[in-house]
Amino acid sequence: MMTRYLVLSLLLSAIMGASVRGSEADFLSDLAANVVKVGLDLDGSGAVPTESTPDDVCTGVSFSRNLKYGENDLNVLDVATGDSKKTASHPVLMVVEGKSFAGEDGVPDTAGQLRDQAICFAARNGMVGVKVTYRLAPANPWPAGAKDVAAAISWVHDNIDLFGGRSDEVVLVGYSAGAFHVASYLAHPELREPDPGVAGVVLVSGIYSPDADANAAEKSYFGNDASKYKDRSAFPGIVNVEAPIVLAWASLDSPGLVAQGEKLKAQLCNAGHCPRTIVLSGSDSLSSALTLDAANKGLAAPIEELVRELESRGLP
């Protein structure tokens, strides 16, 4: 136990410029307070937050796991940092990825678990990666997902500097169901702070306006009353987003998903805010989309270009 606290003490001292003084009891008390602030102690187990992964794509990347940003067991996030963490502050790639709105008793299906590759891409390319899990229907219906995005954004703004990240350069990425939660967060100002707190947005293969053909998982989140779907959609509020947007869907997406993406693009363009649009070549996950294919039609290059633009313009 003492070794664990010493490791965390050195980490916090290096980052925050703190010095350790006083009795051991005072030291442990002060450290515990800081641990709670940054969410490093999720459940009282005291697990050391950083670890490495053997995957080639994550070589040289360190993780801080299961950092709590809300009260629910699913309100956790992971942070990935690279070797350059200590040399400068970095843009943040914040990923909300989920293949469904629902899970049995609010527990996510393992097939829909977040993947590390997306945030490893961030950490290995001069960014800090953050991936977010959120509450699921039927236990947590609309607008729980958008509220969770708001809470996670708040956590990042309060704490990401401890990991070498810049809170004023957050690029918010939503994939699949996560894309709706991100779009809903941006489109409904009543669910967030007046300033959405993001410098750029990436939306991938999402639905943005539920309709009467909603499947069972979607109905468990949006409700069975289709007359309420219009008010719960991302339209028209999403067109008021001022941050630059990258919009993507896959060539193998269902016609319904493609139509959703095309509708969002049309509405944004009509509002004078055309997104950069990419059609991915058969990508079935955000992590695979971040690996460039032979035709360079993945998301890696557009995201890196967006980040460079934000840094050069000093946004927000």
Task: Walk through the language-model features, giving the residues of each.
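Alpha/beta-hydrolase
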Residues: V96, V204, L280-S283
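Short, surface-exposed "cap/lid" segments of acyl-processing enzymes
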Residues: K85-S89, L93-F121
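C-terminal catalytic histidine-bearing segment of alpha/beta-hydrolase fold enzymes
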Residues: A248, P255-K265, C269-P316
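Short beta-strand/loop motif that positions the catalytic acidic residue
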Residues: V241, L247-W249
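N-terminal cap/lid segment of alpha/beta-hydrolase-fold proteins
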Residues: F27-A88
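Mobile cap/lid helix-loop segments that gate and shape the active-site cleft of serine hydrolases
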Residues: D56-T59, A199, G206-G237, A243
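Catalytic nucleophile-loop/oxyanion-hole region of alpha/beta-hydrolase
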Residues: D109-L114, A118-I119, V130-S167, D293-A294
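Primarily recognizes the serine-hydrolase "nucleophile elbow" in alpha/beta-hydrolase
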Residues: A151-A217, Y229
